[in-house]
Amino acid sequence: MDESDPPIKVLSVVGAGRSGTTVLASILSEVDGFGSVGELRWLWQRGVLERRPCGCGEAPDKCPVWSRVLDATLTTAPPERREEASKIVASQRRLAKPRNRWRVLRSARGGDDDWEALVRVRSAMGAACSAYSRVTGSRVIVDTSKRPFDAAVMASLPHIEHYVLHVVRDPRAVAHSWRRSKTFSVAGEARTMGTRRLPATVRRWWASGLGAELLRREVPSSRWLRMRYEDFCVSPREHVDNILSLLGEPGPSPFEAADRVVLHHNHIVAGNPSRFTVGAVKIELDDAWRSEMRTRDQHLVELATAPLMRRYGYRLRH
């Protein structure tokens, strides 16, 4: 990016998986000037190495958007890109180690310029954002990578005007959702999104919440917004308007009605299978856990997550 260019606005969405972030990204991609990249952290693993499909159905190297982004981002020709992408992935994994996460979170304001892994990931993320903005003309990029330390990396980048949306969902609902597999179709091929056991889901929900609370100390309050999934589902248009206000982008709402929006093909590079959804969509609350989740499991989740549940306004049932 040229130093004379205006900064790119980036909204990092943090939170636990199965919290509606991909649907939210699809909605925001309908706003003029917005580009939802999905979980950008997976671009090099799932996009380059595994060639998983973009939201448009094409592999990233065949996608009209991501193929150009990769050409501008990676320094090697296609035959050697796997090695370059592998180095980025290895650095990402190093930053994700539990012993390194706090250090990454503290680097949100900059610094640690001698940490090779962090420097490599910063360079890759910054180049990808700049290239995506140039290719698509987006002035706002929505990144739903969800992990707080990925958002910290984004916050430290020069020429990025960084914002954070912390999406929370009742951990009982998250645990129940992860026990249900999701099947979707890409180019006529059926694919399944796997399940996760309750203890693993609880650990990740807790780690996500704690990481977000730590990240919040490093981000100006004027650039931070917390939103509950349940509140969003009750009044989605109002909450999307709140997000636009946070970003200083009071553009027209993409909603046709208070709870309905028409989604078009997008270029979300990684995320929940809902990124392949097109057409009219009604936003509805999924609270099946209330009737389908065993009381014992609800109690276990509550015991493990009670402090953050109370902080986020969730009532304990047991």
Which residues are covered by each model-predicted region?
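Conserved phosphate-donor/acceptor-positioning beta-strand/loop module used by diverse small-molecule
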Residues: D143-K146, M154-R180
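Short, solvent-exposed loop/turn segments at secondary-structure junctions
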Residues: R18-S19, E30, R41-L43, K146-D150, ...
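PAPS/PAP-binding and catalytic site of the sulfotransferase fold
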Residues: G20-F34, M154-H159, R226-G251, T277-A280
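A glycine- and Lys/Arg-enriched "phosphate-lid" helix/loop adjacent to the NTP-binding pocket
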Residues: L165-H166, V174-W206
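Gly/lys/ser-thr-rich phosphate-binding loops in alpha/beta enzymes
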Residues: M1-G55
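PAPS-dependent sulfotransferases, especially Golgi type II membrane carbohydrate sulfotransferases
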Residues: M1-G17, R103-V119, R179-E189, W206-G209, ...
